[in-house]
């Protein structure tokens, strides 16, 4: 993720641990709510409710440029999560046998996969990131 973010000229990348957001640390929440684009990994099931809550608050502040990631271990669960995230860019991914992170499509059994870095770079370029990108 960092590689994709650093490939965007002028992007500033911050990685914020979930625990800081969950605890309500003001500096972490300020960065989260004020970032131009938030990249949020929803792969950890027990973190999803809090992340969706924080994402909803972020959207209420008018910050609608969000990229949601999900590690695809179960096509059905991935598809259900994707449907929940319909208003955001959703990218499911997995680790290929060659040890590369690649995107998946939960709706079909796809064999043509894009690298996760390429997909993130494309989405960031579409969002015309000028200042800050946050990783969660």
Predicted regions mapped to residue ranges:
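Amphipathic coiled-coil/heptad-repeat helices and related helical stalk/stem segments
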Residues: 24-25, 51
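Conserved beta-strand-loop-alpha-helix hinge of the TIR/SEFIR fold
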Residues: 31-64, 71-73
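Conserved beta-strand scaffold positions in the cores of enzyme catalytic domains, especially
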Residues: 15, 66, 90-92
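Gly/Pro- and small hydrophobic-enriched strand-loop and loop-to-helix capping segments
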Residues: 61-79, 83-87
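C-terminal interaction surface of TIR/SEFIR-family domains
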Residues: 84-136
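Residues at the C-termini of beta-strands that transition into short coil/loop
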Residues: 17-19, 70, 94-96
């Amino acid at each position: 993720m960092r590689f994709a973010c650093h490939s965007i000229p002028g992007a500033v990348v911050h990685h914020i641990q979930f625990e800081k957001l969950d605890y309500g640390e003001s500096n972490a929440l300020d960065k989260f709510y004020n970032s131009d684009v938030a990249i949020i990994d929803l792969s950890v099931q027990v973190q999803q409710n809090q992340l969706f809550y924080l994402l909803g608050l972020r959207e209420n502040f008018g910050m609608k440029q969000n990229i949601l990631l999900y590690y695809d271990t179960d096509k059905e669960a991935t598809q259900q999560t994707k449907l929940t995230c319909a208003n955001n860019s959703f990218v499911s991914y997995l680790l290929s046998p060659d040890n590369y992170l690649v995107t998946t499509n939960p709706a079909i059994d796809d064999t043509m996969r894009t690298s996760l870095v390429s997909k993130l770079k494309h989405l960031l370029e579409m969002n015309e990131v000028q200042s800050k990108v946050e990783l969660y």
